[in-house]
Amino acid sequence: MVLIRVLANLLILQLSYAQKSSELVIGGDECNINEHRFLVALYDVSSGDFRGSGTLINPEWVLTAAHCETEEMKLQFGLHSKRVPNKDKQTRVSKEKFFCESNENYTKWNKDIMLIKLNRPVKNSAHIEPLSLPSSPPSVGSVCRIMGWGTLSDTEMILPDVPHCANINLLNYSDCQAAYPELPAKSRTLCAGILEGGKDTCSGDSGGPLICNGTFQGIASWGGTLCGYVREPGSYTKVFDHLDWIQSIIAGNTNVTCPL
């Protein structure tokens, strides 16, 4: 009887995992074409490879994750379908890139942030509009929107033609500490996801925004080995903690340092 019960429990766990994986911009749907005017697609100029996403914060600047960096970057604005671009799509290249100290000085829990100055400003249009920086930090329990052209599967790289969106929850930092024991006691990151699994950012979604209660609060940074897995939420660079750094660089003070 005990053996039968153990086998039954194992079967339930397997079915539960299979369900979460299949639901796995894992677990989302195609974004509304009008809800991501600020979303930027990043490419490596030399290889043409897709590198992730960024957020347009004013006509000349894009905020993304440091680990999305390549030597020369192409940025596409007003993009929804990659195969059938919007008529108002605009393309720019990186003129300057700014990091916390260097493009290699970041970790899973600190300083995974990059500010890109464009070679020339973009113009607002039907599908292009900057997203404002936050005026206050987010609250645990907030409903947050994730989006990107990242893989739809955690077992193989399946990049969609259009960005996918999903709603997740802003969690306590302790939830990420429980999942990832290597995390320090404090971090300038946000912990977000669905603890029951099923919705998550994944490979290719890096650098994209975490929008909590309508406000830009985080930058997709990293997560568990499997996307959308139970009790393995994602980590997002906390935008609010880097406001002084961002605003100082945009104002021309490039000697400013990131918060410790």
UniProtKB/Swiss-Prot annotation:
Organism: Trimeresurus stejnegeri (Chinese green tree viper)
Entry-linked PROSITE patterns: TRYPSIN_DOM, TRYPSIN_HIS, TRYPSIN_SER
Disulfide cysteine pairs (residue numbers): 31-165, 100-258, 144-212, 176-191, 202-227
Every Peptidase S1 domain range: 25-251
Main location: secreted
Stored InterPro entries: Peptidase_S1_PA, Peptidase_S1_PA_chymotrypsin, Peptidase_S1A, Trypsin_dom, TRYPSIN_HIS, TRYPSIN_SER
Protein name: Snake venom serine protease KN14
Subunit-structure text: Monomer.
Domain of life: Eukaryota
Glycosylation sites: 105, 172, 213, 255
